[in-house]
Amino acid sequence: MAAPIQAEHFTSAIYTLLDETFDNVYGLYLDKGTSLFETLATISAEEASIPVGGQCATLAAQVKHVAFYLDLLVRNVRSGVNEPVDWGKVWRETSVVTTEEWEASKAQLRDSYNRLKRLIADTTAWPNEDHISGTIAPIVHTAYHLGEIRQALCTLKH
């Protein structure tokens, strides 16, 4: 039987992976300057409003979706209720954004990310696999969308 991981070691690793994904690249899996917020800082509202491909979402929709996902996760964990949601709403309703709307979306994402970090800070134990996978999921989910955004930028900026 494997030795259990101490909660503080797991939490520290989660914070490191979150930081790499959202803010500060350590080279664990991203290249320098490619975290989510570093990437978003290079995108104008006009670029964020362009659908990449015929039926594809805009980058603005990608950002709103990630914030929506993080907020939903935090609410569900805090309340203990998995509320039903319309996963398609953000994709249907988000397209062209003004500069002000784009900046507000990025700020909302930052707020959502900070709420997730507070939730993790409030977690003193990782009692089962569901808690652990639920903590890893936002890293994986956000990394997926970061990849989508970075691939779209190859089309939009080149």
PLM-predicted stretches and their roles:
Residues 1-30, 37-40, 45-90, 126-158:
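Short, contiguous alpha-helical
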Residues 92-126, 130-142:
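Acidic/histidine-rich alpha-helical segments that form the ligand environment
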